[in-house]
Amino acid sequence: MVLSSDIDLLNPPAELEKTKHKRKRLVQSPNSFFMDVKCQGCFNITTVFSHSQTVVMCGSCSSVLCTPTGWPRRLTEGCSFRRKSD
């Protein structure tokens, strides 16, 4: 007998999988990712790791792009980012 409130364990919903710990998911995957950060002054794009532990500076104008505060990184006001595709 199948109830409507049952969850299919082989095909769980994506929302449910995102809330689980990275090792408890059906297919293990990391929470970290690389992202492209655009500088607010010179519009130069820099690739940054989401969990990096150092301050990231712009290569051309030396302004601070991100500061380490845990996850997610704190971007400087005015900077924009996008997640890099696999």
UniProtKB/Swiss-Prot annotation:
SUPFAM superfamilies: Zn-binding ribosomal proteins. GO terms for biological process: translation. Coiled coil: none annotated. Keywords: Metal-binding, Ribonucleoprotein, Ribosomal protein, Zinc, Zinc-finger. Binds 1 zinc ion per subunit. A zinc finger (C4-type) spans 39-61. Its cofactor is Zn(2+). Pfam families: Ribosomal_S27e. GO terms for cellular component: ribonucleoprotein complex; ribosome. One of its GO terms (molecular function) is structural constituent of ribosome. PANTHER family: 40S RIBOSOMAL PROTEIN S27. Belongs to the eukaryotic ribosomal protein eS27 family. This is Small ribosomal subunit protein eS27.
